[in-house]
Amino acid sequence: MNLALFDLDNTLLDGDAETLWFEYLHQAGHLEGNFFGKLEEFTNDYDQEELDFSEYLNFILLPLKKWGPEKVKPWREQFLLEKIEPRLRYQNILHDHRRQGHVLVLITASHDFLAEPIGQMLEMDFTLSTRPEIIDGIYTGKVHEACFRKGKVEILNEFLDIQGFKPNKTWFYSDSQNDLPLMRNCDHPVAVHPDQNLRI
Protein backbone atom coordinates (compact mmCIF):
# COMPACT_ATOMS: atom_id res chain seq x y z
CA MET A 1 0.00 0.00 0.00
CA ASN A 2 1.00 3.63 -0.56
CA LEU A 3 0.39 6.50 1.83
CA ALA A 4 -0.42 10.13 1.03
CA LEU A 5 -0.04 12.48 4.01
CA PHE A 6 -1.34 16.03 4.06
CA ASP A 7 -0.75 18.92 6.42
CA LEU A 8 -3.79 21.14 6.96
CA ASP A 9 -2.99 24.76 7.81
CA ASN A 10 -1.75 26.77 4.83
CA THR A 11 -1.55 23.53 2.82
CA LEU A 12 -4.97 22.00 2.14
CA LEU A 13 -6.53 24.96 3.95
CA ASP A 14 -5.96 28.54 2.85
CA GLY A 15 -5.29 29.82 6.36
CA ASP A 16 -4.89 28.49 9.89
CA ALA A 17 -7.87 26.55 11.25
CA GLU A 18 -7.42 27.54 14.89
CA THR A 19 -6.93 31.23 14.11
CA LEU A 20 -10.02 31.16 11.87
CA TRP A 21 -11.92 29.46 14.71
CA PHE A 22 -11.06 32.25 17.15
CA GLU A 23 -11.96 34.89 14.59
CA TYR A 24 -15.31 33.21 14.00
CA LEU A 25 -16.10 32.98 17.73
CA HIS A 26 -15.23 36.65 18.13
CA GLN A 27 -17.36 37.72 15.15
CA ALA A 28 -20.28 35.62 16.43
CA GLY A 29 -20.09 37.35 19.82
CA HIS A 30 -18.96 34.29 21.77
CA LEU A 31 -15.51 35.63 22.60
CA GLU A 32 -14.71 39.07 23.92
CA GLY A 33 -11.42 40.83 24.53
CA ASN A 34 -8.28 41.32 22.51
CA PHE A 35 -6.80 37.91 21.88
CA PHE A 36 -5.43 38.72 18.40
CA GLY A 37 -2.21 40.11 19.85
CA LYS A 38 -1.54 36.85 21.65
CA LEU A 39 -2.36 34.85 18.52
CA GLU A 40 0.10 36.99 16.57
CA GLU A 41 2.79 36.28 19.17
CA PHE A 42 2.21 32.56 18.81
CA THR A 43 2.30 32.84 15.01
CA ASN A 44 5.64 34.66 15.14
CA ASP A 45 7.05 32.05 17.52
CA TYR A 46 5.82 29.31 15.17
CA ASP A 47 7.50 30.96 12.19
CA GLN A 48 10.76 31.22 14.15
CA GLU A 49 10.52 27.59 15.35
CA GLU A 50 10.29 28.85 18.94
CA LEU A 51 6.68 27.97 19.71
CA ASP A 52 5.93 26.63 23.19
CA PHE A 53 3.26 24.22 22.02
CA SER A 54 1.90 23.47 25.50
CA GLU A 55 1.35 27.18 26.17
CA TYR A 56 -0.21 27.64 22.75
CA LEU A 57 -2.57 24.70 23.18
CA ASN A 58 -3.64 25.90 26.62
CA PHE A 59 -4.58 29.22 25.03
CA ILE A 60 -6.28 27.83 21.93
CA LEU A 61 -8.46 25.50 24.02
CA LEU A 62 -10.00 28.39 25.99
CA PRO A 63 -13.44 28.09 24.31
CA LEU A 64 -13.64 24.36 25.01
CA LYS A 65 -12.47 24.80 28.59
CA LYS A 66 -14.97 27.60 29.17
CA TRP A 67 -18.13 26.11 27.63
CA GLY A 68 -17.42 22.42 27.07
CA PRO A 69 -17.65 20.53 23.77
CA GLU A 70 -21.42 19.96 23.76
CA LYS A 71 -22.23 23.67 23.83
CA VAL A 72 -19.54 24.50 21.29
CA LYS A 73 -20.39 21.78 18.74
CA PRO A 74 -23.25 23.75 17.07
CA TRP A 75 -20.92 26.72 16.70
CA ARG A 76 -18.33 24.43 15.15
CA GLU A 77 -20.79 23.20 12.52
CA GLN A 78 -21.53 26.74 11.39
CA PHE A 79 -17.83 27.61 11.49
CA LEU A 80 -16.97 24.69 9.21
CA LEU A 81 -19.56 25.76 6.66
CA GLU A 82 -18.72 29.46 6.71
CA LYS A 83 -14.98 29.58 7.29
CA ILE A 84 -13.44 26.23 6.40
CA GLU A 85 -15.29 24.73 3.43
CA PRO A 86 -14.74 27.79 1.16
CA ARG A 87 -11.00 27.74 1.96
CA LEU A 88 -10.26 24.09 1.20
CA ARG A 89 -8.03 23.61 -1.84
CA TYR A 90 -6.04 21.06 -3.87
CA GLN A 91 -8.98 18.70 -4.17
CA ASN A 92 -7.44 17.61 -7.49
CA ILE A 93 -4.35 16.28 -5.69
CA LEU A 94 -6.51 14.39 -3.20
CA HIS A 95 -8.55 12.98 -6.07
CA ASP A 96 -5.43 11.84 -7.91
CA HIS A 97 -4.06 9.96 -4.89
CA ARG A 98 -7.49 8.51 -4.14
CA ARG A 99 -7.83 7.33 -7.75
CA GLN A 100 -4.53 5.47 -7.42
CA GLY A 101 -5.77 3.66 -4.33
CA HIS A 102 -3.48 5.45 -1.90
CA VAL A 103 -4.44 5.71 1.76
CA LEU A 104 -5.12 9.40 2.53
CA VAL A 105 -4.15 10.76 5.94
CA LEU A 106 -4.62 14.27 7.29
CA ILE A 107 -1.81 14.89 9.79
CA THR A 108 -2.02 18.23 11.57
CA ALA A 109 -0.97 20.05 14.72
CA SER A 110 -4.52 21.37 15.04
CA HIS A 111 -6.47 19.82 17.91
CA ASP A 112 -8.86 16.98 17.20
CA PHE A 113 -12.06 18.94 17.95
CA LEU A 114 -11.44 20.87 14.72
CA ALA A 115 -9.27 18.41 12.80
CA GLU A 116 -11.60 15.41 12.87
CA PRO A 117 -14.60 17.05 11.14
CA ILE A 118 -12.30 18.76 8.64
CA GLY A 119 -10.80 15.37 7.82
CA GLN A 120 -14.34 14.11 7.20
CA MET A 121 -15.06 17.05 4.91
CA LEU A 122 -11.95 16.18 2.92
CA GLU A 123 -12.96 12.50 2.81
CA MET A 124 -9.69 11.44 4.39
CA ASP A 125 -9.24 7.80 5.31
CA PHE A 126 -7.67 8.80 8.62
CA THR A 127 -7.00 11.97 10.59
CA LEU A 128 -4.04 12.29 12.95
CA SER A 129 -4.04 15.40 15.12
CA THR A 130 -3.12 16.84 18.49
CA ARG A 131 -5.06 15.15 21.27
CA PRO A 132 -5.76 17.39 24.27
CA GLU A 133 -6.17 15.84 27.69
CA ILE A 134 -9.80 15.35 28.74
CA ILE A 135 -10.72 14.30 32.29
CA ASP A 136 -14.37 13.56 33.11
CA GLY A 137 -15.41 15.23 29.86
CA ILE A 138 -13.52 18.44 30.68
CA TYR A 139 -10.61 19.84 28.67
CA THR A 140 -7.73 20.48 31.06
CA GLY A 141 -5.69 22.58 28.64
CA LYS A 142 -2.89 20.03 28.68
CA VAL A 143 -1.87 17.86 25.76
CA HIS A 144 -2.13 14.10 25.55
CA GLU A 145 -0.29 13.86 22.24
CA ALA A 146 1.18 16.82 20.35
CA CYS A 147 1.14 16.22 16.60
CA PHE A 148 3.84 18.83 16.07
CA ARG A 149 7.40 18.73 14.68
CA LYS A 150 8.96 15.37 15.59
CA GLY A 151 5.69 14.49 17.33
CA LYS A 152 4.17 14.03 13.87
CA VAL A 153 6.74 11.35 13.12
CA GLU A 154 6.08 9.59 16.43
CA ILE A 155 2.30 9.71 16.02
CA LEU A 156 2.53 8.48 12.43
CA ASN A 157 4.77 5.56 13.42
CA GLU A 158 2.39 4.64 16.23
CA PHE A 159 -0.53 4.79 13.78
CA LEU A 160 1.26 2.57 11.25
CA ASP A 161 2.03 0.00 13.94
CA ILE A 162 -1.56 -0.07 15.17
CA GLN A 163 -2.98 -0.38 11.66
CA GLY A 164 -0.35 -2.87 10.55
CA PHE A 165 0.48 -0.68 7.56
CA LYS A 166 3.83 -1.03 5.82
CA PRO A 167 3.71 1.54 3.01
CA ASN A 168 5.81 0.99 -0.09
CA LYS A 169 5.91 4.72 -0.80
CA THR A 170 4.89 7.75 1.20
CA TRP A 171 4.03 11.27 0.04
CA PHE A 172 3.78 14.25 2.38
CA TYR A 173 2.48 17.69 1.43
CA SER A 174 3.27 20.62 3.74
CA ASP A 175 4.02 24.33 3.80
CA SER A 176 6.10 24.55 6.97
CA GLN A 177 9.67 24.19 8.13
CA ASN A 178 8.21 22.73 11.33
CA ASP A 179 7.29 19.65 9.29
CA LEU A 180 10.84 18.95 8.16
CA PRO A 181 11.22 15.96 10.55
CA LEU A 182 8.34 14.19 8.79
CA MET A 183 9.30 15.39 5.33
CA ARG A 184 12.74 13.84 5.81
CA ASN A 185 11.09 10.52 6.66
CA CYS A 186 8.99 10.38 3.47
CA ASP A 187 9.85 9.16 -0.01
CA HIS A 188 8.17 12.10 -1.73
CA PRO A 189 8.08 15.32 0.34
CA VAL A 190 6.21 18.09 -1.47
CA ALA A 191 6.42 21.75 -0.44
CA VAL A 192 3.09 23.52 -0.91
CA HIS A 193 3.16 27.31 -0.53
CA PRO A 194 6.39 26.88 1.47
CA ASP A 195 7.28 29.33 4.21
CA GLN A 196 10.53 31.26 3.86
CA ASN A 197 12.77 28.81 5.69
CA LEU A 198 11.32 25.74 3.96
CA ARG A 199 11.81 27.51 0.63
CA ILE A 200 15.51 27.93 1.44
Model-derived regions: residue spans:
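C-terminal cap/substrate-recognition subdomain and adjoining C-terminal extension
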Residues: 1, 74, 81-200
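Active-site neighborhood of HAD-like aspartate-dependent phosphohydrolases
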Residues: 1-48
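Residue-level signal for pocket-adjacent positions within structured domains
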Residues: 7-8, 59, 127, 138
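Amphipathic alpha-helical interaction elements
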Residues: 13, 27, 48, 61-65, ...
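Amphipathic alpha-helical segments within well-ordered protein domains
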Residues: 22-23, 61, 77, 187
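Short, compositionally biased "basic patch" segments
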Residues: 43-68, 126-127, 131
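Metal-dependent phosphoesterase signature
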Residues: 55-89
